[in-house]
């Protein structure tokens, strides 16, 4: 299964109940944990943070994105961020179904 195929399947609101989907979700969650571990276990400049988040999200994030780690996502590839977004430390995102953060949003820590 591809990331795009998974995103399209999720949009149909059908159950995520096949072996193929479970394997894909496990693989993607493992990848997200590897990337967020690198992000969260050392100091990074904002350019480095954006680079790691681009890897996690699967596209180049806006240069105006600011994130204070630690940052957590269980999937990563279904998060969309707009321009001028700020995400404070310790935010957790469960994004298998999709998370869209619009322009200018500021998200506080939990």
Give the residues covered by each predicted segment.
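A structural motif detector for beta-strand N-caps
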Residues: 59, 63-73, 79-91, 99, ...
